[in-house]
Amino acid sequence: MQIYMVGGAVRDRLLGRPVNDHDWVVVGATPDDMVARGYLPVGRDFPVFLHPETREEYALARTERKSGRGYRGFVVQTSPDVTLEEDLSRRDLTINAIAASADWTGAEDLFDPYGGARDLQARVLRHVTDSFREDPVRILRVARFAARFTDFTVAPETMQLMREMVHDGEADHLVPERVWQELARGLMEPQPSRMFDVLRDCGALAVVLPEVERLWGVPQRPEYHPEVDTGVHLMMVLDMAAHLQAPLTVRFACLTHDLGKGTTPHDVLPRHIGHEQRSARLLKAVCERLRVPVECRELADVVAREHGNIHRSGDLGAAALVRLLERCDAIRKPARLDEILLACECDARGRLGFADRPYPQRARINAALAAVQSVTTSSVAAHAAQLGLSGPKVGEMIHAARVQAVADWLHATAQPAPEPRGNAG
């Protein structure tokens, strides 16, 4: 029985990156051998075991044979006769197909039959063998790695293979859970735009996210968007979200906030009046199709509907500001308002020449919320009771008190209006 470190741990160590998790492959063993040594079986589709002390995963060396379309169409074979090279051959990229002895200290301890170390040096993402085409999830993984390793390029032959897979319909069989899983991971990488560049280049974006694909080539008003192209703007917004270290909820909201611009009638371009409502409808379809988690779905919906109003909040009076806060549910969920405003800031700064501009709307709306929170609702309700009021009338009094508090704040501070964003959104 021989044990080797494989995959991302070897790759990241060779790149000088932090190694958080270790993956191990075991050659020459049976499941009974592993159990006899105290390993805990946990694999559902193939033999994977947890180390009795470290709890790290150890997988028996295996081969995979395509038996149908999509992610699940595989027959897995494990036996003590499966070699390390055979196990590595089923992996997606050469940089992930390097093995090392458990106590490796240098290059002499590496087993690299497919040139992964060479591709690490050359900064190339290259498929291991033609069996890459058997799993369409690998298209998404290559795109995600492009977003992580921002100085790597996709090998031309790998890009061509991915295009062939899309043309042959393999991407049509991606299951929603895996699409979302890879999309979420890609959004959290240092340069998310590169994921979408790769997916567009191979044609997969039109399959998995046609609502996003159609944004390229859609013009916006240049006085608000010097970059003009909506797809280009979207990528700038995503990279700004990464730059500001936004959480996944915010990054997904950034991805989907302008979907409605892809359905703007051609005869009104480059204006996009009402795109916020259209974006929300398209967002709902995306979330249902990909089974997006509720926290991402809810934040993205608010951002899609309200980002234009938040951009223009400098033009809003007290009553309109309070209504905006209420629509954002900011009074009950002030922490979520921070994420809404962060997404809007990414939108505003994700424009050509605006990356270093301030976003005073954030401070203005937070100050308006503070004024609203200064209203003691129990005191207002008690006063309403003294007046013999109940039910909806109490709510109206609370709302009026909040509007007055914001009006007093606006008057006391003589708040200047932020730079207008117009209707560009």
Swiss-Prot record:
CDD domains: HDc (cd00077), NT_ClassII-CCAase (cd05398). Keywords: ATP-binding, Hydrolase, Magnesium, Metal-binding, Multifunctional enzyme, Nickel, Nucleotide-binding, Nucleotidyltransferase, RNA repair, RNA-binding, Transferase, tRNA processing. It comes from the Bacteria. ATP binds at residues 8, 11, 91, 141, 144. Its EC number is 2.7.7.72, 3.1.3.-, 3.1.4.-. Residues 230-331 form the HD domain. Coiled coil: none annotated. GO terms for molecular function: ATP binding; CCA tRNA nucleotidyltransferase activity; cyclic-nucleotide phosphodiesterase activity; magnesium ion binding; phosphatase activity; tRNA binding. Mg(2+) binds at residues 21, 23. Pfam families: HD (PF01966), PolyA_pol (PF01743), PolyA_pol_RNAbd (PF12627). Magnesium is required for nucleotidyltransferase activity. Its cofactor is Mg(2+); Ni(2+). Monomer. Can also form homodimers and oligomers. Belongs to the tRNA nucleotidyltransferase/poly(A) polymerase family. Bacterial CCA-adding enzyme type 1 subfamily. Comprises two domains: an N-terminal domain containing the nucleotidyltransferase activity and a C-terminal HD domain associated with both phosphodiesterase and phosphatase activities. Catalyzes the addition and repair of the essential 3'-terminal CCA sequence in tRNAs without using a nucleic acid template. Adds these three nucleotides in the order of C, C, and A to the tRNA nucleotide-73, using CTP and ATP as substrates and producing inorganic pyrophosphate. tRNA 3'-terminal CCA addition is required both for tRNA processing and repair. Also involved in tRNA surveillance by mediating tandem CCA addition to generate a CCACCA at the 3' terminus of unstable tRNAs. While stable tRNAs receive only 3'-terminal CCA, unstable tRNAs are marked with CCACCA and rapidly degraded. This is Multifunctional CCA protein. It comes from Acidovorax ebreus (strain TPSY) (Diaphorobacter sp. (strain TPSY)). The gene is cca.
